[in-house]
Every structure is written in C-alpha cells, then in structure tokens.
Design a protein with these regions (language model features):
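N-terminal substrate-binding region of glycoside hydrolase catalytic domains
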Residues: 11-13, 27, 31-55, 76
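Histidine-acidic metal/acid-base catalytic patches
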Residues: 2-9, 17-34, 66, 172-338
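Active-site-proximal loop/turn and secondary-structure-junction residues that shape catalytic pockets
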Residues: 12-16, 40-42, 78-81, 125-130, ...
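Active-site acidic/histidine proton-transfer and metal-coordination neighborhood
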Residues: 22, 26-27, 67, 82-191, ...
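Surface-exposed, active-site-proximal loop segments in enzymatic domains
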Residues: 42-56, 79-103, 125-137, 235-247, ...
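Short beta-strand segments at enzyme active-site cores
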Residues: 37-38, 72-77, 118-125, 158-162, ...
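Alpha-helix-loop-beta-strand connector modules within alpha/beta enzyme cores
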Residues: 55-77, 142-155, 181-182, 254-261
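N-terminal-biased segments
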Residues: 9-23, 57-61, 104-106
C-alpha cells in the first residue's frame, strides 16, 4: 500500500519578478512542481488578478499549463477580503453589499475554478471594523461564509478559509469556531504559521492554533516568520505591508517540523476525505514572501522560491512526510516514451 503523501504547490506569482505567465511557469517547472495556485498573472496585457481574467487569457494560460506540465491547485482569489460593514475605520478595505458580492464575485470565482479544472478556492473571513473585537462579528461572518460554502458546494467546489491578521478569522481558535458554526462540507480551513506569528503569538501558541484548526483542516500554506512580533496586543491590528521578517520553513519560529510530523498522522484520513470531494490530496502551498509580503500578496523571486522549496523539503524529510518532485520518469512520460 503506497505511503500517504502531500502534494507540493506554490503561489506562482511569488516565483516571478515581472509576473508573466512564462516566467511563473518556467520557475515552477524547473523546481519540479506539478501544481500551482493562481493569483496574479500577466498574459500579455499587464498584470491582472485571477478574478479579472478574460476567457481568451484563461485559454492562453491553459495552453501554457499543458506546455509546462502544471495543474492548478487552487484559485487564490481575494474572496472575503472586504469589509463586513459599510463603516469608515481608517483602512482602505472595500465594502461590497453581500448579496451583490455573492452573486458576482463568488460566482466568478466558481466559474474560474471550473475553467482551470480545480476543486479549490482559497478565501478569507471578512474584515470587521478595525478596532472592534472579532468575536463581536462572528455571527455575521458565519452567516456570509455559510452562504459562500453553499454556493461552492452547488458548483461541486470547496472553499478554503485562510487564517490571517485583521480578519474575523485571525486566529486558529476563531477559524475553528467559524468552521464549527458553519458546519458545511464545502468549508475547510487553511493553516499558515507566519500569519499567526506576525500577530505576536509565540511558537508554543502557534502550535495551539494549529491544534484548534486540525478538525477543519483542508490544506496548509507554507510561510514562516523569523521571530514573534511585538504588537502590544496579541491578535490586534497588524500593518501587513510593514512585515519584513518572512523566512523559509526551516528558518522560522513556526515549528513546521513538529506541525508537519503531526500532519503525517492525519494524511490517510484527510486524503480520503478530500478525495471524496474530487480533490487530489493534501496540498502544501508555498507562499514564502522571502523578498517581502503584504495584504494582497508577496514576492520571493525564482531563487527565493527555490530556497523556500528546498527548506520545506528538508523539513518534510525530517518529519518523515512523503512528497514528490518531477523526475526523469515524469519527463519520459511527458515525452510519451514510457
């Protein structure tokens, strides 16, 4: 019986300085990846977020995917990165009435997932007013995320809710509570150690947030931070565009070796659960930000992505988690000579 393994992927735009499709795909193919998550890309008419792609651009990307041997792991859409309430709070976050958002943006993300033949959409848990307690807005966030999960479910898709600063679901505990209340098979959670560390959590606290998220886990973003941030208030507002200490998974305080060793024991059951929804397995999606990151993305460059991937593979080897990078047999299969 084959050993359960993880599927390696990356936010492709992080591997490219100019975000062109060829640059992104060349870097990932050279690193041996077979999957990528699609966020921002230039197909010849300037850099666009995935949500803005035209059908002609989608078709061009699909042809390039075939050429470079890549498949989409997830649509890395900014779904849920808008305000819950139409209230001025000193941020630049947009507000969109939810009925309109569900009918337009969420529907568009579902269409994109089908166009790129993936079952996964990455998203977020909405911004409460800047200085409010996120707990005070759980009810509305749960209601809206439940409707998003149902929209994805009706399209045979799964919505992954990422933990991130400043959102309602800014901690593992809060995301776990959202997941419990929504209670929908199309909603899973996306763990990200750096997104917790940068809010002032200690390594021991990051482990507790991981444990809270495990029952709802769908996949993991691989990003680490050099040291806990002194924020004054754990879980308080974070100026995301000023964060500067992102590091590979073998250099940070996120405890990835312990977390991934724990994930190893979850892989058989979690893989089966995801496969029942048409998802090929458990993704580890590299989003290293090693050249910098902010609210709507980050950059690593082709060399930085390579450094981050090698760091992750070293951690996986120590944690005894199986994975696969393209090898000569894959090349022969692509040539049609096997």
């Amino acid at each position: 019986m084959p050993q359960p393994h993880v599927l390696l992927s990356a936010l492709a735009d992080e591997a490219a300085f100019h975000l062109t499709a060829v640059e992104q795909f060349s870097a990932l193919a050279a690193l041996g990846l077979e999957y990528y998550s699609l966020r921002n890309i230039d197909v010849g008419k300037g850099v666009k977020n995935v949500m803005k792609l035209t059908m002609a651009e989608i078709q061009k990307i699909r042809h390039l995917e075939d050429e470079y041997g890549l498949n989409v792991a997830s649509i890395a859409a900014p779904i849920g990165k808008v305000k819950l309430l139409d209230k001025a709070d000193g941020t630049k976050n947009a507000y969109v009435p939810f009925k309109q958002y569900l009918a337009k943006d969420v529907a568009k993300a579902c269409e994109l997932a089908h166009a790129f033949e993936t079952k996964l959409i990455r998203g977020f848990s909405f911004y409460p007013p800047k200085d409010d307690r996120p707990e005070d807005h759980l009810e509305q966030a749960v209601d809206q995320l439940g409707k998003i999960a149902e929209a994805c479910h009706r399209s045979d898709l799964t919505f992954g809710l990422e933990v991130e600063a400043n959102l309602v679901g800014r901690s593992g505990q809060l995301l776990a509570e959202i997941h419990r209340r929504v209670n929908h098979p199309a909603l899973v959670l996306v763990f990200d150690a750096a997104n917790i560390l940068c809010q002032g959590y200690s390594p021991a606290q990051v482990w507790k947030e991981w444990e809270a998220m495990k029952p709802g886990l769908g996949w993991v973003h691989i990003k680490d931070y050099k040291a806990p941030v002194k924020t004054g208030k754990r879980g308080g507002h974070v100026e995301e565009d000023k964060l500067a200490n992102f590091v590979p998974a073998d250099r940070g305080a996120g405890g990835h070796e312990r977390i991934l060793a724990d994930l190893r024991g979850m892989l058989p059951a979690l893989t089966k659960k995801l496969e029942r929804r048409g998802i090929p397995g458990v993704f580890l999606d590299l989003e290293p930000h090693v050249r910098g990151g902010g609210q709507f993305g980050g950059t690593s460059g082709p060399d930085g992505m390579g450094i981050a991937l090698r760091g992750l593979c070293g951690v996986l080897d120590k944690a005894k988690v199986a994975y696969h990078l393209r090898d000569f047999d894959d090349l022969l299969a692509a040539r049609g000579t096997v």
